[in-house]
């Protein structure tokens, strides 16, 4: 995917396609550098420009169910293989976990990299940001065997119908990434990489990822976390 860039950013992404005006963009999206940050813009105006600032996540409680899925792994290496907007990774880092993030989409990776760099310079967020490492890679190909204690997956789930309740950031994520169709390969790679467990975030109504039954699941208010245990793990159902 070609990344369209409008404006003179200090550290432009490699191989960015520079454009002079929005209509020059190759595709529906472009990044606009202004006011010292990137804005994700939609040429079809389906949503306003979106930015990412990890400081906005400070003070938000977030899900308390997700950290429970990583119980006993406070000091272990964890991978977030589908980083997206980084909200879940930030929540876990704020609870003391250390994570390596993987994001293959160039737009989301650029937004994440800029936001993480800014968070590292902000005294309010630096300690949390220090627990996050970002990779621009497809986790289905990049995850090495037995490289993490746990791998977290939040793959895009195709919406059954459009809803006004879907947040703008999620709308953009759906339009940018869509449903990749390689869920089976991603889950298989994650299970090879995890020495303890794989956690898959799913809507309550959704079937298991790639129709592969988990060992057990943990329910949140609107979300289900399916847990796949690694062979010979000390973890129990």
Go through each PLM region and give its residues.
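S-adenosyl-L-methionine
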Residues: 1-78, 94, 102-150, 237
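Local beta-strand N-terminus motif with an aromatic residue
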Residues: 27, 75, 148-151, 195
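Hydrophobic alpha-helical segments and helix pairs
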Residues: 62, 68-109
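Conserved proline-anchored active-site loop of SAM-dependent methyltransferases
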Residues: 78-89, 148-164
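A short, acidic, amphipathic alpha-helical segment used as a generic capping/interface helix at domain edges
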Residues: 138-142, 178-191
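Mobile active-site "lid"/loop adjacent to the S-adenosyl-L-methionine
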Residues: 155-186
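Conserved Class I SAM-dependent methyltransferase catalytic core
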Residues: 183-229
